[in-house]
A protein has these predicted regions:
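Active-site helix/loop module of the DD-peptidase/beta-lactamase fold
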Residues: 103-139, 188-227
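Active-site Gly/Thr loop motif
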Residues: 208, 266-318
């Protein structure tokens, strides 16, 4: 009897040890630390980057900042490991998840929400049901049904329903974005967060991703299409940007089709704003009058209160920025733009001080006098 008990105990112990090892292996397999480089090695000036910290500390609610150049971290500020809510950055990540399923035909962008059986608590008008999946992911559906979560259309700027034809007007509308999430699950059969884990987090080697933190959220009495909030650390946000910079390729694997990366970061809705030249497929497209060459082709995921993932193809650079929920204050879009300019300035060649002018040689008075006398003698 004792022998049997010992045998059973040994068997159970082996099973438990195996499970623990498997769990540890999965965690290690997920974690893939970033390589690090000195700013000078990639042509950036370290002293100028330090101005970012000075500005952020004195003026913003920045809690984490990562600057990646040529695939290596060259500068960090704050706690880059802290995982927190990333607000509307979720929409750009959803665009990335859409990529392969659009390219392989699983998701058809010309399908209408009526054909997909999409409806909502207040009911959708026949005209609204003509909006396509493409309209949803470009914020041009013309459907102004209340969203399950705040954000998007300002409270003081309501649009009349049934007036705007789909595809004709850009309105940043959370209803569109949330329904795009519903469509993703409906067409792929995948939970958004499971897809996030298997298609992005694991292959990217995210260091801080936690599937358990991710749950749909919103007021189902307002709309049955809930928001797919996402939570990342700043250093893992940088991985998302780096994947886009690399045209969707990571460690030899094409995680997001290159054609989708190009398409989603091209202008769909032109915008005449100081910092935005347009909106693509769930990505903001940037410009800057002060540094037009450095900002050429730049685009960004942007979330309320200071959540940003910005890609600079011209500089082979990614900037990830966060103002976490515990920040005493938030970071405005204007403040973030100033941070980006400080980083760009650090990439500019160091100006050489002008060469000192040769001092004019003043002749000695004794030397001048005889010459003057000679001249007078003539």
């Amino acid at each position: 009897m004792n022998i049997c008990k010992k045998s059973l105990f040994s068997h159970l112990a082996i099973r438990w040890i195996s499970m623990i090892c498997l769990l540890l292996f999965s965690v290690v397999a997920l974690a893939d630390p970033w390589p690090v480089a000195e700013p000078e090695s990639v042509g950036f000036q370290k002293d100028k980057l330090e101005k970012v910290a000075e500005y952020a500390t004195e003026n913003t609610g920045t809690t984490g900042l990562v600057v990646v150049v040529n695939g290596k971290i060259i500068y960090t500020y704050g706690d880059i490991k802290q995982v927190s809510y990333t607000a509307s950055c979720r929409k750009s990540v959803l665009s990335m998840l859409y990529g392969k399923y659009v390219v392989n035909g699983t998701i058809k962008l010309d399908e209408t929400i009526g054909q997909l059986g999409i409806d909502d608590v207040q009911g959708l008008l026949p005209q609204e049901k003509e909006a396509t999946v493409y309209d949803l992911i470009t914020a041009r559906s013309g459907v102004y049904h209340p969203a399950s979560n705040p954000g998007g259309i300002p409270e003081d700027k309501k649009y009349e329903r049934g007036v705007t034809r789909h595809g004709t007007r850009f309105v940043y509308n959370n209803w569109d974005f949330n329904v795009a999430g519903t469509v993703f699950t409906l067409k792929t059969g995948l939970d958004i967060y499971d897809a996030l884990e298997q298609d992005l987090a694991k292959p990217l080697g995210m260091e801080d991703f936690d599937r358990a933190r991710h749950k749909l959220s919103g007021n189902a009495e307002m709309s049955k299409h809930l928001a797919y909030y996402m939570h990342f650390s700043t250093r893992d946000m940088a991985r998302i940007g780096q994947l886009m910079l690399q045209k969707g390729r990571w460690n030899g694997e094409q995680l997001v089709p290159e054609e989708w990366v190009v398409r989603s970061t091209s202008v769909v809705s032109p915008l005449n704003r100081e910092f935005h030249c347009g909106y693509g497929i769930l990505w903001w497209l940037l410009r800057d009058k002060q540094y037009p060459e450095q900002f050429k082709g730049a685009y960004s995921a942007q979330g309320m209160y200071g959540q940003f993932i910005t890609v600079f193809p011209a500089l082979n650079m990614v900037v990830a920025h966060k103002s976490a929920g515990n920040a005493k204050k938030k970071t405005t879009g204007g403040q973030y733009r100033h941070i980006l300019r400080l980083i760009v300035e650090a990439s500019l060649p160091k100006e050489e001080p002008p060469a000192p002018k040769e001092e004019e040689v003043v002749p000695d008075v004794k030397e001048v006098a005889p010459k003057m006398e000679e001249k007078n003698a003539e």
